[in-house]
Design a protein with these regions (language model features):
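C-terminal cap of thioredoxin/glutaredoxin-like
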Residues: 1-3, 79-192
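Structural alpha/beta surface segment adjacent to cysteine/selenocysteine redox centers
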Residues: 1-79
Length: 192
């Protein structure tokens, strides 16, 4: 998509958990969210999965962390399995991630800093619904577009194309010199 739009795009997944997201997921799985035990267990599992994700990100990089997150999501999506640290370790091993290395990273002080930075970013963009997509240009203060809900690549492509056209149209009307369109600077966008 980035090549097609001639954009430099950086993608950052932030695994967030909100009370609304927990309840919606529990309803989807036919779990009772009205008991504090179920909510506490769900919250603990979410925090544990989030910690593993960030530890993998620190130790192995974002690409490996995304693979872990997707594999975890896939294994839990049918509702047949419940989250446990043992499941997380099993999935890490299947991705050639050494649980021992992750265990030491989980104790590292920088883990809390990385999580705090992403939480700050989520607060900055006022993310309240999950999943959400934030598109912003890091070179322009106060830029950004918040999209709630699941989006396909085609949806994002259409948004980028329509946004680019609507942003550039007034510029094209100001000048008859079409090459101005092609010299428009390429933004560095972040997709959260």
């Amino acid at each position: 998509m980035a090549e097609e739009l001639q954009l430099e795009i950086s993608v950052n997944y932030i695994p967030l958990v909100t009370m609304e997201a927990m309840k919606a997921d529990m309803v989807k799985r036919n779990w009772n969210f009205n008991t504090s035990i179920n909510l506490a267990n769900y919250h603990n599992a979410s925090v544990s999965a989030q910690s593993f994700y960030y530890a993998v990100q620190i130790a192995y990089g974002k690409k490996k962390a995304r693979s872990f997150l997707f594999k975890l999501q896939e294994s839990l999506s049918d509702g047949q399995r419940s989250y446990s640290p043992a499941l997380a370790e099993e999935l890490m091993e299947s991705l050639n991630i050494k649980p021992k290395k992750i265990s030491s990273t989980l104790k590292d002080a920088c883990l809390k800093d990385v999580i705090a930075q992403d939480q700050q970013l989520a607060r900055k963009f006022q993310i309240t619904a999950l999943p959400s997509t934030v598109i912003f240009d890091d070179q322009i203060d106060d830029s950004g577009l918040l999209l709630d809900g699941e989006l396909s690549d085609d949806d994002l492509l259409q948004i980028f194309q329509n946004s680019a056209d609507s942003c550039l149209e007034p510029l094209m009307q100001l000048t008859e010199n079409a090459p101005l369109y092609y010299h428009y600077p390429v933004s560095h966008l972040h997709l959260l």
